[in-house]
Design a protein with these regions (language model features):
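N-terminal cap/lid segment of alpha/beta-hydrolase-fold proteins
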Residues: 2-28, 230
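Catalytic active-site module of serine/aspartate enzymes centered on a nucleophile-bearing elbow/loop
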Residues: 283-323
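A catalytic-pocket lid/entrance helix-loop region that shapes and gates access to the active site
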Residues: 125-178
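Conserved acidic catalytic loop of the alpha/beta-hydrolase fold
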Residues: 86-104
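Conserved HGGG/HGGXW glycine-rich cap/lid loop of the alpha/beta-hydrolase fold
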Residues: 18-76
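Short beta-strand/loop motif that positions the catalytic acidic residue
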Residues: 252-253, 259-261
């Protein structure tokens, strides 16, 4: 069982001004001469942390992490202005150009897999390979499953807490009801809705209860950004065309991909990964038997660390023992 690499500090930090009012936080760690990899975080609105750097051998990889618009250390916090998928794709290209990188590996989980796929399909010539976890295709049925009916039947106790801020007469369209509160002027109602939204995700993210994950999702600062930005994206169908990611998978058919997905992922059910793998013959699908959605689960963590080592071995032409 592979574990995370030891915690490391960035060797460079950047504040990158993009379209107003946004300033992105970007950092670099590992080897400045290593294989560039971009860690694409989830949410949207989740942000990066010290854990984000630890899936990669710092002697082999130049590790780039960034907080997407409105979250983490990027500013302004929880802003929805000029915040769409197209903006985030443009930001990734801006970061690549700013750092002088020709091509890089994309490493993304959950919404990070969505954004990685969308970017790779827009700029396939800039991508070496993709390592994806917890695939989220952002189809209408995917939103309905987690935010209207589906996961609710597996976790009725957690679901009751999730819908508590919404009066019964508005529960026919929960995403719209949450959006009204998350974008409203009543700050108490906004925070109540944000905590309920974020905690629902945190409590269902792992196969076995994990208080550390729940506590991270319950953090007030994080919850506000994630709930507002996620809801903003999801009521707009992630600013993607219908079935866009599967429709355009031919654009990355030549790229290698490793897909890691938990068998019991309730947030992004396994059929997301299965459909992507079926459409992308150059991908490898690893189904983790005893895991849900979170990258912190042992089986998923092991598979991701191994995947990063395998991609480095292939691209750097290393003997197996060095990767």
């Amino acid at each position: 069982m592979q574990t995370l690499y030891p915690e490391i500090k960035p060797y460079a930090r950047h504040e990158l001004a993009v379209e107003a009012p946004h300033v992105l936080y970007v950092d670099e760690s590992g080897s400045p001469e290593g294989l560039p990899v971009l860690f694409v975080h989830g949410g949207p609105g989740g942000g990066c942390d010290a854990l984000s750097r630890r899936f990669f051998d710092p002697n082999l990889y130049r590790i780039i992490t960034f907080d997407q618009r409105g979250c983490g250390r990027s500013t302004p916090h929880a802003s929805l202005e000029n915040n769409t998928t197209a903006h985030l794709i443009a930001d990734m290209e801006h970061i690549r150009d700013f750092l002088g990188i020709d091509k890089w590996v994309l490493f993304g989980g959950s919404w990070g897999s969505t954004l990685s796929l969308a970017y790779a399909q827009a700029f396939p010539e800039r991508v070496h390979a993709l390592i994806l976890r917890g695939i989220f295709l952002c189809r209408p049925e995917d939103f309905h499953w987690f935010y209207q009916e589906g996961a609710s039947r597996l976790f009725p106790d957690y679901w009751q807490d999730f819908i508590a801020p919404i009066p019964p007469e508005e529960r026919g369209d929960l995403m719209q009801a949450f959006y009204k509160r998350l974008t409203g002027t009543d700050q108490i109602a906004q925070m109540h809705a944000a905590k309920a939204w974020s905690c629902w995700e945190g409590r269902t993210a792992t196969l076995r209860p994990n208080t550390q994950v729940v506590d991270r999702f319950s953090d007030t600062h994080r919850a506000l950004a994630m709930a507002r930005i996620e809801c903003h994206y999801f009521v707009n169908q992630a600013f993607l065309e219908p079935n866009q990611l599967l429709r355009d998978v031919h654009k990355i058919a030549h790229l290698p991909g490793i897909i890691v997905h938990g068998r019991y992922d309730v947030i992004c059910p396994l059929d997301n990964a299965w459909a992507l793998h079926e459409a992308w013959p150059n991908s490898e699908l690893q189904i983790i038997r005893e895991a849900g959605h979170s990258a912190s689960e042992h089986g998923i963590c092991d598979a991701l660390v191994r995947a990063a080592a395998e991609i480095a071995q292939r691209l750097l032409d290393l003997p197996p023992e060095e990767a």
